[in-house]
Amino acid sequence: MHFYQNVLKFPLTELIKNRDYPGSSHFFFDINNSNLLAFFDFPGLDLGPYAEVLGGLHHLAISVSRDKWAALRANLDAAGVEYMEESGTSLYFRDPDGARLELLADPLGEMYGNQVL
């Protein structure tokens, strides 16, 4: 939770008890543009590190304004996060659990200056 709240500055909007697994929580972060990112914690359940698999999730792209992108890049730098790939509008990196994320500063509906929608 620290990484998403304090490094990426995504507000925690809801924290509820997971009724399917005792002692577990279900929590949601506001990632902009009316989107939420949800996670479960499973204390005591050793699932091992995150692993990319064929057909699985490649990465989660999160669109932010250019100003917010620059501020988040500074936060990532200060936290010592290594980039897998970067350009003037896109950063690929991993969260502390190994999930691949992308921060994208292109306006919604554009990619690298081209209209996509």
Spans of features found by a protein language model:
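Core segments of cupin and vicinal oxygen chelate
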Residues: 1-36
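A short, acidic/glycine-rich surface segment
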Residues: 14-15, 23, 44-49, 111
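A short, polar/charged loop-to-alpha-helix boundary motif
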Residues: 108-117
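Vicinal oxygen chelate
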Residues: 54-100, 107-108
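Residue-level "edge-of-site" marker
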Residues: 17-18, 89-90, 111
